[in-house]
Regions:
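An alpha-helical interface "stripe"
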Residues: 1-186
Length: 186
């Protein structure tokens, strides 16, 4: 009898968090609002010095969110390359322009980087103007780096080809599921 995809999913998560792994499983992150809140917290923690200890206001965080709306995976990839090893967003606070570090390439596999795993994320249909039928989707496993979804994984058991997972991701792209905070997925 083929293994259930939910079991494969659980084994993957267990493998990623096993031992001295830096990955943390976040079963509490299920919606886009949860993900934005988590990203905001990590961004503020990693930039306390630049923020002078003052958290981002809602208006300032809207500036950040607007910068993270990528029109393509390529545009997201360009941003992720960063400048001088740092991936940044910029916030106007009164008369000051703040440069907040989202990722520091020197902190990969350590430093201030935060590695998290989510599963069964609810990708709700939000595009009422789409020609595609309205469908909510549930993503299998997504890997977050500093709160941003970076890697999306659709798992298949032995009854289904890995190409079925590939086609499923292509379908999600066509349905516009990789938008908002998910627009940085690579």
């Amino acid at each position: 009898m083929p293994e259930l995809e939910s079991m494969i999913e659980q084994k993957l998560i267990e493998q990623l968090v096993y031992g001295d792994s830096q990955w943390t499983y976040r079963k509490d992150l299920k919606t886009e609002a949860d993900l934005w809140e988590n990203f905001r917290y990590i961004l503020e923690q990693n930039n306390k010095d630049r923020l002078d200890g003052e958290p981002l206001s809602d208006q300032e965080f809207e500036q950040v969110k607007n910068q993270l709306q990528f029109s393509s995976f390529y545009k997201a990839g360009e941003w992720l390359v960063g400048e001088n090893g740092k991936v940044q967003v910029h916030v106007q606070r009164d008369t000051k322009r703040l440069h907040l570090v989202v990722m520091n390439h020197e902190h990969i596999a350590g430093g201030s980087s935060v590695y998290e795993i989510i599963n069964q994320y609810s990708a709700l249909n939000t595009d009422e103007n789409s020609n595609m039928p309205a469908r909510d989707r549930r993503f299998d496993v997504t890997l977050l780096i500093n709160g941003l979804p970076m890697i999306h994984i659709e798992l298949k058991n032995k009854q289904h080809s890995y190409m079925d997972g590939f086609r499923q991701i292509k379908k999600y792209i066509g349905e516009g599921k990789f938008t908002g905070i998910f627009s940085a997925v690579q």
